[in-house]
Amino acid sequence: TILLSSLKGPFVASESTVLPFVPASVYRNDKVSGSAELNKYDVYYYSESLKTLWVYTRRAAGRITEVSPSASAPASITVAGTSYTLGSTAIASQVSSLNGGGVGQVVTLLLGMNNVAAGIITGEEADEVFYGVVQSSARNLIDEDNSADVLQTVKVLCTDGLAREVNVDKSLNFPTGWLVEVRVSPEGESVEKINQRSVSGTVNENATALGDRALADDVQILDTSTGGVAGTVR
């Protein structure tokens, strides 16, 4: 109750955002962090009385495939196969059909607590890259301009823990277990296999380094197998 009454946010950070206090505790993507750094488009909340900062860097990006409950007044949208609640009327207006948005629009959602969309990026800045492992791929018949066609959808579990579904060329093959890059640009979405690179070593006791390589404060680690089984470690 004390937390809820003192919590302020969500806010979307700009390049010049300065907090009104120095936080004693910081949580980044719900995990304890030693850095209070805010980068452009980070979603953040704070409690000045508790001297605590919460930062979220998770994003969802892709083409909108569904809006609900209506195109003119959306409360949620589906992007890359997952439905997200829109956190404010200002965000909803950006994807409303009344303003030229909606199904088919390429967006990047800035996700805050409980993966609610706290901000949205459209246009040229809606450019994101995710990495993950192919979970499955499926081809289905669709009706395209009054003729039958095949739509292939690839499901990828990414390093941020989110599963993304991307439509790709029907002639391409993406076997389960492949490591891939999912790229989202204003022109649409693409999936490409990535070349394997490796590092080795022992994780230190504070989980801040692998061998002699320091780990970023917000590093994302995905444990995978050749059979496509995967889960986030951090």
Label every PLM stretch briefly.
Residues 1-234:
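...the same signal can extend to comparable exposed beta-sheet modules
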